């Protein structure tokens, strides 16, 4: 299998990165061993005379011009605005082919430009090599002068958090929540299995806003700007900075700086709690002792009587069985254990969620018996 080289941007930064982030050093070595090509200059990311150039592709992703991005979004009209994030805004757009897409416009203050550029490079480098039904597809990108855009497949039902406690009026049912959890677990399993690029990938920013839903509520993981390739033959990566989102941080990672695949499992467990309770991972509108979801429910997940009190009140009682709820809560409780070695693997999560779906469906409470097959 052919694996493309990491961007020249990494080479320009490697003299600094090696001192602060051993993973970046190992990452470069691994890819250099796969390739004998030399690094191209960073300017190769930009498109010279874009208006007159034919469509180019990088690793299977289309390259677009700034003009095409403006035309696709009606000059970034507020009517096409889908949402805002830490590194810019996301717009709905329509390409010349008629395809509806989501376009992330990277828009950063000067002091954050280096971080934004890094995330842009990582996302294009990694996501354009991945292919799985539970990962959002990168259609293309634009690197025109100082402008940076990422073009994704359009996900009609937005992100998971909006359906649980956000702007979406219709709340998703328990069987659909189980299916979403299973789909997300399969996406993580693909990343962790090393089948995509030869070595495992840690997402590092798994959360409910990064679980997108298509028209049939199939889950797809998005936003790979903080993703890390694990060092070859290693299960731990020491990083200089702890990156991610508050509320989803692996406690072991924050205290030691050691990033592992199990860091994603902790975040996955937090999302399971969101699916179960309908609450946010962190809710700053609540009192100081009620803001953090994990701290609120950790000690009652294995108490069947108390567990009933935290089940999302939006869930119809006839949509779930307490047996399935109990199994689901038990899985979540093991995912959020303090010590990473005590957490289940992502494949264990996949298998248990398949069993939970089957258990819930036995009582005729929605859903179908899942097909047990290899990912």
Swiss-Prot record:
Keyword Oxidoreductase: no
Sequence positions that bind ATP: 82-90, 104
Assigned keywords, A-Z: ATP-binding, Cell membrane, Kinase, Membrane, Nucleotide-binding, Phosphoprotein, Plant defense, Serine/threonine-protein kinase, Transferase
GO BP term (any one): defense response
Alphabetical list of Gene3D superfamilies matching this protein: Phosphorylase Kinase, domain 1, Transferase(Phosphotransferase) domain 1
A GO MF label: transcription cis-regulatory region binding
Keyword presence, Acetylation: no
Enzyme Commission code: 2.7.11.1
Annotated positions of the Phosphothreonine modification: 65, 245
Modified residues (Phosphotyrosine): 152, 253
GO cellular component: plasma membrane
PANTHER family, per database record: OS01G0750732 PROTEIN, SERINE_THREONINE-PROTEIN KINASE PBL28-RELATED
Annotated protein name in UniProt: Probable serine/threonine-protein kinase PBL28
